[in-house]
């Protein structure tokens, strides 16, 4: 029986790796947020999502974060976003999710 559990666990891990690889091909960056043994997967939000979040949220950073997180979620138990402590934890990581490449601008 233990052998069967190991095989199904291995299959689940392989399935998860394949799904993540598919997401990376489609979206580029993929992030995993793990809390209490549960995982949530996010893509880096695109400009349309960030623009819409700015319009909807205006001066409310929590609404902004909620919109971006819900619209960037790829997989996992979405009901975790309703847990305030999970939401607050993710909100503290928004800069990482919405990271930018910084280059150098030269006056020629």
Task: Describe each model-derived feature in a short phrase.
Residues 2-3, 27, 34-108:
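Short, surface-exposed, charged amphipathic helix/loop patches that serve as local interaction elements
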Residues 12-13, 17, 32, 77-78:
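Alpha-helical interaction segments
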Residues 1-24:
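Short, basic/low-complexity N-terminal boundary segments at the transition from targeting/disordered tails
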Residues 23, 32-33:
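A general structural signal for short secondary-structure junctions and capping/turn motifs
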């Amino acid at each position: 029986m233990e052998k069967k559990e190991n095989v199904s666990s291995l299959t689940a891990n392989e399935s998860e790796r394949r799904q993540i690889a598919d997401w990376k091909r489609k979206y580029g960056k993929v992030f995993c947020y793990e809390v209490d043994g549960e995982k949530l997967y996010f893509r880096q939000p695109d400009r349309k999502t960030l623009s819409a979040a700015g319009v909807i949220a205006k001066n409310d950073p929590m609404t902004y974060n909620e919109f971006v997180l819900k619209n960037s979620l790829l997989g996992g138990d979405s009901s975790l976003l309703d847990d305030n402590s999970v939401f607050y934890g993710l909100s503290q990581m928004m800069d990482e999710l919405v990271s930018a490449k910084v280059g150098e601008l030269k006056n020629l």
